[in-house]
From Swiss-Prot:
<dbReference type="InterPro" id="IPR007905">
    <property type="entry name" value="EBP"/>
</dbReference>
<dbReference type="GO" id="GO:0000247">
    <property type="term" value="F:C-8 sterol isomerase activity"/>
</dbReference>
<comment type="function">
    <text>Isomerase that catalyzes the conversion of Delta(8)-sterols to their corresponding Delta(7)-isomers.</text>
</comment>
<keyword id="KW-0753">Steroid metabolism</keyword>
<keyword id="KW-0444">Lipid biosynthesis</keyword>
<feature type="transmembrane region" description="Helical">
    <location>
        <begin position="185"/>
        <end position="205"/>
    </location>
</feature>
<dbReference type="GO" id="GO:0004769">
    <property type="term" value="F:steroid Delta-isomerase activity"/>
</dbReference>
<comment type="similarity">
    <text>Belongs to the EBP family.</text>
</comment>
<keyword id="KW-0756">Sterol biosynthesis</keyword>
<comment type="function">
    <text>Component of the microsomal antiestrogen binding site (AEBS), a multiproteic complex at the ER membrane that consists of an association between EBP and 7-dehydrocholesterol reductase/DHCR7. This complex is responsible for cholesterol-5,6-epoxide hydrolase (ChEH) activity, which consists in the hydration of cholesterol-5,6-epoxides (5,6-EC) into cholestane-3beta,5alpha,6beta-triol (CT). The precise role of each component of this complex has not been described yet.</text>
</comment>
<dbReference type="GO" id="GO:0031965">
    <property type="term" value="C:nuclear membrane"/>
</dbReference>
<keyword id="KW-1133">Transmembrane helix</keyword>
<keyword id="KW-0225">Disease variant</keyword>
<keyword id="KW-0152">Cholesterol biosynthesis</keyword>
<keyword id="KW-0443">Lipid metabolism</keyword>
<keyword id="KW-0413">Isomerase</keyword>
<keyword id="KW-0968">Cytoplasmic vesicle</keyword>
Length: 230
């Protein structure tokens, strides 16, 4: 006589055997409030800092962009950095960030499975885009001449990683989450990651606009110098 056993975990595919899984002891609301509170605090601090610490006045749009990069610094360095270091013990670990990743994994179980792609992708993100996001903030506050180059590089890197993130899961048949679930699929998997396609795309166009304008000015000056010599 066979019996259907219900998996003792919330992850997909449902047949996954996760013997060392320890359920979160923090409510989902506490985890999400903690995450968004820290992010909100960083936005407020960066908004105020961009008004007082910048060597030249910055417009509202530029200050919002710096708030974005400040949040990216936190998420890439701290949250994704934690995953890069401790992905092998997430299932049984009860640290706040481990519980955050176990919660997010309800939308994409590749994270609690230490999938090769997500481990490598998140490690690159933590090591490169985290520090460089902080550098973008500093570069704009100090009006460093390469600031738009940094913005372009970081934003392109974020888009590239996000596109691969979606495409690899699509290639595997979206099997690591419950398709259509309003929270786990649409909010965790789709919305939270789509943000890293939309905002970086806007910032890529912004950087291209400023770099193109600067190149046009330089070309114009060079042409004037050449015309004088001729």
């Amino acid at each position: 006589m066979t019996t259907n056993t219900v998996p003792l975990h919330p992850y997909w595919p449902r047949h996954l055997k996760l013997d060392n899984f320890v359920p979160n002891d923090l409510p989902t609301s506490h985890i999400l409030v903690g995450l968004f509170s820290i992010s909100g605090g960083l936005i407020v601090i960066t908004w105020l800092l961009s008004s007082r610490a910048s060597v030249v006045p910055l417009g509202a749009g530029r200050r919002l962009a710096l708030c974005w990069f400040a949040v990216c610094t936190f998420i890439h360095l701290v949250i994704e950095g934690w995953f890069s270091l401790y992905n092998g013990i997430l299932l049984e670990d009860q640290a706040f960030l481990s519980q955050l990743w176990k919660e997010y994994s309800k939308g994409d179980s590749r994270y609690i499975l230490s999938d090769s792609f997500v481990v490598c992708m998140e490690t690159v993100t933590a090591c490169l885009w985290g520090p460089l996001s902080l550098w973008v903030v500093i570069a704009f506050l100090r009006q460093q001449p390469f600031r738009f180059v940094l913005q372009l590089v970081v934003s392109m890197g974020q888009i590239y990683g996000d596109v691969l993130y979606f495409l690899t899961e699509l290639h595997e048949g979206l099997q690591h989450g419950e398709i259509g679930h309003p929270v786990y699929f649409w909010f965790y998997f789709v919305f939270l990651n789509a943000v890293w396609l939309v905002i970086p795309s806007i910032l890529v166009l912004d950087a291209i606009k400023h770099l193109t304008s600067a190149q046009s000015v330089l070309d114009s000056k060079v042409m004037k110098i050449k015309s004088k010599h001729n």
